[in-house]
């Protein structure tokens, strides 16, 4: 597979426009079809699945385009990918956070494996979450409506379901800059059930800190920002963050649970040390389509998250992406993305 993909993207300059278009087309195909496979899976299963449970479908769709599969081979690859995909029960990792995360690696592996097997003639059709009549509504408007346009960019490196509470807190602090850790006695988070399950007041490792609500909220308030350094390493055991985290209560609100998963929402009640209270409105996460991050905010997020690459490497990655449209070779242009960092990560 990798050799064939390199053949597609390693063309000479005369084919540069074609290969750049193919790269972006394949990316769009992969994301769009994986998202639709996800909505189909969620609609036909009582379990809330992590994205690794359906992303293999997107890998196959993108790969089949690049490798010019015929219809029969493509169909079998989809069936193989679906059949071998991981189960990925999301709530298990929420309730017991580990390095399994959202199983992105499993989805990528399964998709690539399905492409290889189908190329060798292995059969596997049909993929029920693509072909079954019960999921037709998730595929009928393909090419007319884009699921990609309904997606989001997380401002912070923690679970998606914690983001509304973080957004609400920043808005309260924008209105009242005096709402600092020293001024807060207690903080009550009302949210939907799945978000309530995050809890996470005293994490013991980075996985627990990032699949949490109380701790990252406390870290944001205490440190004034929430990046990788606030949910890894020494910060996890920082006394000032933990002191506030222990004063945060996370509870389910029935009205917000009723609106999930169509909306993910939270509201906060902050009690100051003088006894006064401030209540946030019901708040959606920053970075959703209706509250999209600006290009500058996305670049700032990249700079914060890529700091451990070193400035030179991080800038090379940004430059590679910006210049892709003018590059003679997509593979060569994107080399900085795949280079290992020479900086050690603590």
Question: What function would you assign to each model-found segment?
Answer:
Residues 1-22, 55-69, 159-177, 221, ...:
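Alpha-helical support elements that line or immediately flank enzyme active sites
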Residues 92, 96-109, 116-346:
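Terminal-appendage/accessory-domain detector
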Residues 7-107, 113:
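Glycine-rich, mobile lid/loop segments that gate access to catalytic sites or pores
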């Amino acid at each position: 597979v990798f050799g064939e993909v390199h053949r597609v993207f390693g063309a000479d300059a005369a084919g540069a426009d074609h290969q750049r278009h193919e790269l972006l087309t394949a990316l769009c195909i992969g994301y769009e079809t994986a998202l639709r496979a996800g909505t189909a899976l969620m609609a036909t299963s009582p379990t809330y699945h992590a994205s690794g449970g359906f992303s293999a479908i997107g890998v196959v769709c993108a790969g089949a385009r690049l490798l010019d599969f015929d219809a029969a081979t493509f169909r079998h690859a989809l069936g193989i990918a679906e059949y071998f995909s991981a189960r990925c029960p999301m709530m298990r990792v929420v309730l017991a956070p580990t390095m399994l995360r959202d199983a992105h690696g499993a989805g990528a592996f399964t998709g690539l494996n399905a492409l290889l097997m189908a190329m060798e003639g292995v059969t596997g059709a049909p993929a029920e979450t693509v072909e079954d009549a019960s999921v037709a509504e998730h595929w009928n408007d393909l090419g007319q409506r884009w699921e990609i346009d309904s997606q989001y960019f997380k401002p912070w490196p923690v679970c998606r379901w914690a983001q509304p509470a973080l957004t609400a807190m920043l808005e309260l602090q924008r209105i009242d800059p005096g709402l600092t850790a020293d001024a807060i006695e207690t903080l009550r988070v009302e949210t939907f059930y799945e978000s309530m399950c995050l809890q996470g007041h005293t994490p013991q490792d980075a996985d627990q800190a990032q699949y949490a609500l109380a701790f990252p909220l406390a870290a944001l308030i205490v440190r004034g920002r929430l990046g990788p350094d606030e949910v890894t390493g020494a910060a996890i055991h920082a006394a000032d963050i933990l002191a506030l985290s222990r004063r945060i209560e996370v509870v389910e609100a029935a009205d917000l649970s009723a609106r999930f998963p169509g909306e993910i929402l939270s509201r906060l009640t902050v009690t100051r040390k003088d006894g006064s209270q401030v209540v946030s409105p019901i708040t959606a996460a920053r970075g959703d389509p209706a509250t999209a991050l600006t290009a500058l905010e996305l670049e700032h997020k990249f700079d914060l998250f890529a700091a451990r690459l070193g400035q030179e490497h991080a800038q090379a990655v940004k430059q590679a992406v910006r210049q892709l449209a003018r590059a003679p070779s997509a593979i060569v242009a994107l080399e900085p993305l795949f280079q290992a960092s020479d900086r050690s990560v603590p």
